[in-house]
């Protein structure tokens, strides 16, 4: 008597390995953001000077290449979400890392604008499937109480990659490896290697405790109709179109802009790295703040205001004020995305079951913003070098309006 474990004891013992394992899953998820998405993406802006000289590209063509990578995200964002909902994130992410890594390496074989644009589109087609399934993974492994933190860690992984990609790709990796082409080859091979831990990973458990959307998704048409009927998802899509487009355009243009006004190349790259480093530093604190605040929407609106302020200041800032503007805008980027993903999963009628498709739909809007914002903004540089930042800040204002209209929606 007293020696036989109770059911509660058995549950505690059996659940402990799963509790520990979810942190391993989260570490792989964050590393996937770093090595398979962020570094291969953010290396391009700092390599553009070298690429443009090698391929004889103009400023507008550079903006087109930077923006066109978002084109497939308009479509594959939704497709990738549906695939993740139906096949599971484990298999989806294993395949996506393998294929995105190969496509990223192919960019290094480009010989002109057409081939560069084609390979950039192919990379975007496959890499855009990764973030939504990473955040869906967080939704299936973590409870609502821990979801903000989990998404914050995943977002910090993205920010770490953005920081490293912008900091070392042009000043360290390119000279060391012998040029921009070899940099892309190495980054592609690294992303491909991440396919293995996802392939070997345990299947995700059932719903980790999030309310709403507990039922499995039905037929594809029914799933899409269900998501399309949630008005708040469309408003969040409108919001991310403006805010993501603002950030995408600004990050691609910033190193070129600073070089153009006389900054040394290393300092221009450091400004972009600072944006990403500040974002990485505050990703988890901002996610935790939203948990304590009790209103994701309020946190998102505060973040949008900071992006608007920072990007707007870049249009007129000079000298030390550039660093201030970069810090203000960069403070919230990845924390904003962590809260945004959590907001989608927590929206009434979504939950983890529909999370992939819902995130995919909103990321389609993000891809549209990322596609149109860079070339449109860059084309305004002929009026004055700072005018593109004014345009992109205006896009973020449009996104802020979408957040204002997307009232809180609790299950």
Residue ranges and their predicted role:
Residues 44-45, 231-273, 278-283:
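Extracytoplasmic gate region of multi-pass secondary transporters
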Residues 86-96, 291-304:
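Cytoplasmic membrane-interface "Motif A"-like loop-to-helix N-cap segments
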Residues 119-158:
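Cytoplasmic helix-loop-helix junction between adjacent transmembrane helices
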Residues 75-113:
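Conserved MFS/SLC helix-loop-helix module at the cytosolic interface between two early adjacent transmembrane helices
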Residues 351-383:
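A late C-terminal transmembrane helix in Major Facilitator Superfamily
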């Amino acid at each position: 008597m007293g020696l036989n474990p109770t059911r509660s004891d058995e549950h505690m013992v059996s659940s402990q390995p799963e509790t520990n394992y979810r942190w391993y899953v989260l570490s792989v998820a964050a590393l996937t953001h770093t090595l398979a998405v962020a570094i291969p993406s953010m290396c391009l802006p700092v390599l553009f000077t070298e690429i443009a000289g090698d391929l004889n590209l103009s400023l507008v063509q550079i903006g087109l290449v930077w923006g066109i990578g978002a084109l497939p995200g308009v479509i594959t964002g939704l497709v990738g979400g549906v695939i993740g909902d139906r096949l599971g994130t484990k298999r989806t992410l294993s395949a996506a890392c393998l294929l995105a890594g190969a496509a990223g390496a192919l960019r290094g074989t480009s010989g002109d604008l057409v081939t560069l644009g084609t390979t950039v589109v192919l990379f975007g087609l496959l890499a855009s499937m990764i973030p939504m399934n990473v955040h869906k993974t967080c939704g299936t492994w973590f409870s609502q109480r821990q979801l903000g933190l989990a998404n914050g860690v995943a977002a910090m992984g993205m920010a770490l990659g953005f920081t490293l990609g912008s900091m070392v790709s042009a000043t360290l990796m390119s000279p060391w490896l012998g040029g921009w082409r070899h940099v892309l080859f190495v980054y592609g091979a690294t992303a491909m290697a991440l396919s293995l831990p996802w392939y070997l990973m345990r299947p995700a458990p059932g719903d980790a405790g999030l309310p709403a959307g507990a039922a499995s998704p039905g037929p594809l048409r029914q799933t899409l109709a269900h998501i399309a009927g949630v008005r708040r998802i469309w408003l969040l899509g409108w919001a991310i179109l403006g805010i993501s487009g603002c950030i995408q355009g600004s990050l691609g243009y910033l190193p070129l802009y600073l070089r153009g006004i006389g900054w040394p190349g290393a300092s221009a790259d450091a400004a972009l790295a600072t944006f990403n480093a500040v974002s990485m530093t505050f990703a988890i604190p901002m996610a935790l703040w939203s948990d304590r605040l009790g209103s994701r929407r309020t946190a998102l609106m505060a973040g949008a205001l900071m992006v608007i302020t920072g990007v707007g200041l870049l249009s007129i800032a000079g000298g030390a004020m550039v660093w201030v503007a970069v810090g203000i805008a960069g403070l919230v980027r990845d924390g904003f995305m962590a809260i945004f993903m959590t907001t989608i999963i927590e929206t009434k009628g979504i939950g983890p079951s529909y999370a992939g498709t819902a995130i995919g739909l909103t990321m389609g809007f993000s891809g549209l913003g990322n596609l149109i914002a860079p070339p449109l903004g860059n084309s305004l540089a002929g009026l004055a070098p700072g005018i593109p930042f004014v345009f992109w800040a205006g896009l973020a204002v449009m996104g802020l309006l979408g957040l204002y209209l997307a009232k809180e929606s609790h299950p």
